[in-house]
């Protein structure tokens, strides 16, 4: 069913424009570009993220300072991020200034020039960013997990890229990657606020004038998840683990995805939920424990991350498997209703944010998914039964004695060893 508040228009050159008319005092406008880690060769690894930094560093008519001042003098904000499957450049402004937001995005997406001095400056910034994440225990744990769970797949690598790549990227590398992926048919402009769709489309059409360029899309390997056990030592003082297994994908049905969300909430929807109660409250095995889920176009995973003492790892891993498999049966009516209420509340909070709505619409348009109203989604949530949850649990979660998990463990470095792992 069509969401009456969301309108979609595909322009003649392939650019897609999505608007959601909603009663906010500000407007959020973003460009969703279908390129990220997954599109990069090994030699290009890190280019999507580097390019995300560079689009703010000068265009044919504006310097980096002029670009930021163009939005900030209006009280607005601009930012960007890179993920596995997309790069997003966005701005948020007061309602009356929405045309300035379109002008800004059109300029940085079409006219970035990548000055040499800015490349060198951002190269140093990204090197510091890499070092920062390498010194963050949770980031390093997640990176180690992805390296093993998706070994051999592009998504096993870091979005930031390796230092040797960052140190060698040239202006031509940035230009070539920019010209390859920042093309009309590969971009969605998504906006939310008090917006007239037709007026917005006409202004976007006039602002984005570049023609069609052929784009070669990367197809993700389906079900590239691997059941591997890996362990390494590191400089951090506390041990961690992530165990995970194949999860739902972005292309699965809305009902399956929502049932999966409810399942995840039953497991870890707060301090009274199963995972926290079993691992921390009942057994005291971990200071921090949480369910982790990640959904991609053709891949996904669900698992448990914990920070704990090394002596508790084996017991905590087994208990985590027990908790995960526990949702295959014996879900109480109270648990199910609590999860439904929690998921609905979270959904309601997103509908109170123009940035959340524009983001959801941008992703849905980029990957060809349907749009749903809040009421349609709420109706779906409360229609889900315990049997629906059991079916999804049995489809994705192995039995508690199964080895169908990727198990990754990080422990403090043993200083008695002569050499680090």
Labelled PLM ranges:
Residues 276-277:
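Phosphate-proximal small/polar/acidic motifs at interfaces that engage nucleotide phosphates
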Residues 1-27:
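N- or domain-start disorder-to-order transition segments that initiate the globular core
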Residues 35-44:
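Short pre-active-site segment immediately N-terminal to the catalytic Zn-binding motif
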Residues 46-59:
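Active-site SXXK
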